[in-house]
């Protein structure tokens, strides 16, 4: 698709997308939105928190009711809310009054409105003639986090704002999946970052807060045009010069890793088009929902991406993404026990990996989720055909379940690259990509490129015995043993279905750092470079969010079960041995771990010191953050 305006900046004038070729007009829109008070907090005050919560679930009735009752208190804000957030047609005069400088005509030039086909207005104005009804061509919503300035983010309208099946080149907005990725991405300072499958640009906005330069890619010109518009609209808040965006942001058109082949990044973030979709011989690109469907059969898009991502990571670089994976039927084990076999085999040797499965769906649940996501139920006959095709597709590969979760990859800092020699960059012809705790105006349907709420149906943390840095299979997952070299990175696969702290990124980063350190110390001790793990000489205290729970038979002298529960982070619950419980009970930061174990040995009559099992159990408590190191 060619740019609409000759000489315009790349992606600034793409048909059927918001335009950013007139920076002054976009700046005027920004000023008008701010003057109208079109912010998360002001909109919530106007319609009420319950209506905003319903709106996040794609339910507009409560907000419309609130606008009818209270909209006259703030006509400008009411008009913008009805127009951009609810998708209701509004009179041109009402938009002129709400946006004093830009007005309705400016919105038309920016590609944000179209003439309405409805005959009556549910908004704030009446009348006809020279005051036509206009409808939003794009969703434009306020967005903020606890640590950022207010932003406004454009994307395509959702199904509840514009009834009917979504367009196949739909530009995804802010939803549950994109928010999950925002909250699970660590915000360490980096020189270069890659937003793979940028969609509306939400991940790029957050990356700009801690990355010197961001490359954002997508297979969709409309998505890149929308991202560019959002960057120009929010340039001051993002620290950008709208006339020199390329100084900090580069937009690249192409499939998956093709646009960045041969380049290396300190951080990669992606909500890739991982949704499994039945393939048909006669399908064309125009029939595919490119924002969520990479065009490959089964979970191959995830398989190839996990294999190829290390090839674009700089030494020490990390990748953070959401993904799903098929779990084949196993007559001996349930999917909960076998899900990691596939992902573990896809990741190149030497690459550190942490996969957290958050949800498991059977084929029927999965089909229903994604058919409804694109509003395909609005075509009953087509829905039934597509549903049957999903079940046939899964049956052809003997799929028992589909897992969804978070992925963390890291390239070692001090080893030669192995991924590039074993895996080329991902270059599928048909692959596509659209992907701090955010507040307010974001749909919580896990939207189009995301997945169902990973915490759905879970209320209590699962229980497991803690695993040490060298790893063992537990009820919560698998930690593969580290290689002999002290530079090896861990490979962790675990299931965490219960609600977790948000944003979770700080806790994940801290746990990963502890696990890497403990693994290297264990490898040094095993190789003879050190007599014993170095952590034994350090002092620890119980984390402030940790509580102990004891269960016992009435009248019994000793408990039959001792639990430690976390109130923060991944909110793990672990079963402790009596020895480990005794160790944790003495950790007040005064004595080293070795001193405590020596005292326990005297008390319990050990002849040869603590068992390897106890040492691994304590190391697991340290890695998972139940015990925190005390600094000198």
Which stretches of residues belong to each language-model region?
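Conserved SAM-binding motif I beta-strand of class I
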Residues: 213-218
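S-adenosylmethionine
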Residues: 166-177, 187-188, 219-388, 401
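Short hydrophobic/aromatic beta-strand or adjacent loop that forms the aromatic wall/cage
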Residues: 401-407, 624
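Core SAM-dependent methyltransferase catalytic element
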Residues: 405-415
């Amino acid at each position: 698709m060619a740019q609409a305006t000759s000489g315009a900046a790349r992606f600034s004038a793409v048909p059927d997308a918001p335009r950013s070729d007139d920076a002054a007009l976009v700046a005027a829109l920004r000023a008008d939105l701010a003057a109208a008070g079109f912010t998360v907090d002001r909109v919530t005050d106007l319609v009420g928190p319950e209506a905003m919560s319903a709106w996040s679930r794609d339910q507009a009735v409560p907000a419309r009711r609130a606008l009818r009752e209270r909209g006259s208190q703030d006509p400008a804000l009411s008009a913008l809310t009805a127009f951009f957030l609810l998708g209701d047609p509004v009179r041109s005069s009402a938009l002129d009054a709400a946006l004093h400088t830009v007005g309705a005509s400016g919105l038309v030039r920016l590609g944000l409105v179209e003439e309405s086909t409805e005959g009556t207005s549910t908004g704030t104005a009446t009348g006809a003639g020279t005051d036509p009804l206009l409808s939003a061509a794009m969703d434009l919503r306020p967005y903020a986090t606890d640590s950022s300035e207010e932003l406004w983010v454009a994307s395509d309208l959702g199904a509840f704002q514009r009834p009917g099946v979504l367009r196949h080149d739909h530009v995804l907005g802010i939803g549950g999946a994109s928010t999950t990725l925002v909250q699970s991405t660590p915000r360490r300072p980096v020189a270069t970052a890659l937003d793979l499958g940028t969609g509306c640009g939400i991940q790029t906005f957050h990356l700009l807060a801690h990355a010197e330069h961001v490359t954002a890619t997508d297979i969709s010109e409309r998505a890149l045009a929308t991202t560019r518009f959002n960057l120009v609209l929010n340039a001051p808040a993002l620290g950008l010069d709208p006339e020199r965006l390329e100084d900090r942001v580069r937009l690249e058109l192409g499939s998956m890793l093709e646009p960045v082949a041969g380049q290396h990044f300190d951080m990669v973030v992606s909500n890739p088009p991982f949704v499994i979709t039945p393939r048909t011989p006669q399908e064309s690109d125009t029939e595919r929902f490119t924002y969520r469907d990479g065009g490959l059969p089964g979970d191959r898009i995830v398989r190839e991406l996990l294999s190829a991502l290390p090839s674009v990571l700089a030494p020490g670089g990390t990748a953070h993404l959401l993904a799903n994976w098929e779990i084949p039927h196993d007559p001996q084990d349930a999917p909960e026990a076998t899900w990691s076999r596939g992902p573990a085999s896809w990741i190149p040797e030497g690459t550190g990996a942490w996969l957290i499965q958050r949800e498991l769906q059977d084929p029927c649940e999965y089909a229903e989720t994604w058919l409804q996501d694109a509003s395909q139920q609005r075509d009953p006959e087509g829905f039934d055909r597509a549903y049957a095709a999903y079940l046939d597709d899964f049956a052809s590969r003997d799929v028992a379940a589909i897992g969804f979760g978070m992925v963390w990859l890291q390239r070692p800092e001090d080893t030669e690259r192995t991924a590039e020699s074993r895996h080329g960059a991902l270059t599928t012809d048909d692959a596509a990509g659209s992907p701090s705790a955010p507040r307010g105006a974001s749909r919580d349907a896990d939207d189009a490129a995301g997945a169902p709420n990973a915490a759905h149906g879970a209320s209590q943390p699962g229980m497991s015995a803690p695993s040490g840095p060298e790893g063992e299979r537990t009820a919560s997952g698998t930690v593969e043993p580290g290689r002999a070299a002290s530079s090896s990175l861990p490979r962790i696969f675990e299931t965490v279905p219960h609600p977790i702290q948000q944003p979770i990124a700080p806790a994940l980063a801290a746990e990963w750092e502890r696990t890497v350190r403990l693994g290297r110390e264990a490898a040094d001790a095993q190789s003879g470079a050190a007599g014993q793990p170095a952590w034994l000489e350090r002092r620890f205290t119980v984390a402030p969010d940790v509580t102990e729970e004891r269960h016992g038979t009435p009248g019994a002298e000793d408990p039959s079960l001792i639990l430690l529960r976390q109130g923060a982070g991944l909110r793990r619950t672990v079963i402790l041995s009596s020895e480990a419980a005794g160790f944790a009970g003495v950790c007040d930061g005064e004595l080293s771990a070795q001193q405590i174990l020596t005292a326990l040995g005297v008390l319990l009559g050990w002849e040869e010191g603590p068992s390897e099992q106890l040492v691994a159990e304590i190391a697991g408590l340290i890695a998972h953050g139940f015990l925190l190191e005390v600094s000198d």
